[in-house]
Amino acid sequence: MMRKESWNFPRAFGVANTVELFERAAYYGLFIAITLYLSRIIGFGDIEAAAIAGVFQALLYFIPTFAGAYADKIGFRKSLMLAFLLLTLGYGGMGILPTFLESAGLVKYGEVTEFTGLIDSSAKYAVLPAMILIILGGSFIKSVITGTVAKETTKSNRARGYSIFYMMVNIGAFSGKTIVKPLREAMGNEGLIWISYFSAAMTFLGLLVVFFMYKSKEHSGEGKSIKEILDALVRICLNFRLIILILIITGFWMVQHQMYATMPKYVLRLAGEGASPSWYANVNPLVVALTVGLVTQMMRKRTALFSMTVGMFIMPVSALFMASGNMLQADILGMHPVAFMMVIGIAFQGFAETFISPRFLEFFSLQSPKGEEGLYLGFSHLHSFLSSIFGFIMSGVLLERFCPDPRLFETREAWAAAATNAHYIWYYFVGISLISAVALIIYGKVVKRIDEKQS
């Protein structure tokens, strides 16, 4: 007789999921516009802004495993309070900093930003401490919230518990990205500053909820030590099979990260300030939500490698759609062709993700040494660490070369001449995704042959 899934969850579970929604709204509201903020508000060039944003996201994938070890020692409640305090200070700092820069006479904010010395001033690097606070706070959130879901659910409701958790993640991400457009429309570039205040308000609300409502089972003293985690990292780096797999999947995520690295600046520069890159980005989770069940059902009798390979070959198609917009002239369904084809490309990216993401952890665990899968899975997101750094830096270089910042040119005509081949950016990502797809096929055949010889 099958046991019915339960809807009864402890209070800590509900509180954790609620504050996860607030945190995701804060993060994605800022992150979808982070390269715009760093360039239009703080004065960084495309390459500098991309490098900072890339390292920012990379560390948010790398540090949580270590933060989780500390959270296990001090307890989840203290960890969450520390996390939301750090996040509120970090987001608030990114909101307040422009006020100090403007009062120092380095810049004037409004619909359009007028730089009066900030670009050449070291004062712009004052944004880095605020971003470090967000990295530290976000690292605790990732480990503690998932830990709470795991520990506050039982066999009878765990599947439903994780379903609720991922729903909250997506609702938060969707709502955070949605707020960007009305702020930009109402305030122009100055709206990018108020996104930080929105994020600070969300995380401060999370802090209040944790302080007054969060009380979980005692978890302090549990979990792995920092030494055990470092040992696992060293062993992964020495495991040739896992490193090759991570590098191959890094290619996929390098392309996927362009939704945050390249897309906002590319669309606004080519389609105009009326474009809505933050709303276009929401097409990705929408497509994932609508198709992941169908794709999972279709691929249920196929191997993880087969499913991942299908997704890898969809990625170059998405990049080609993104490139095609700059070669079309007429509007499509009332949208600028660059914007319309970008939406189509993002939709294909989301579809590709449904073939890859659900099966990667399964395949990764199969490549791990027997009996040590759990320890190795703690670093299964190393591909996102690498792809954030390489993908964002590559974005900055390509934007500067093919679709430079219009404010660097005296006339719109001069900029248009420099950006004639802006769509070439996406051809590079077509190449990366194709190489990754072919490499995954070769990897699968080689690994299969090695396993057959050893059996």
Segments and roles (model prediction):
Residues L60, A159-R184, M202-T203, S380-S395:
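Glycine-rich segments within core transmembrane alpha-helices of 12-TM secondary carriers
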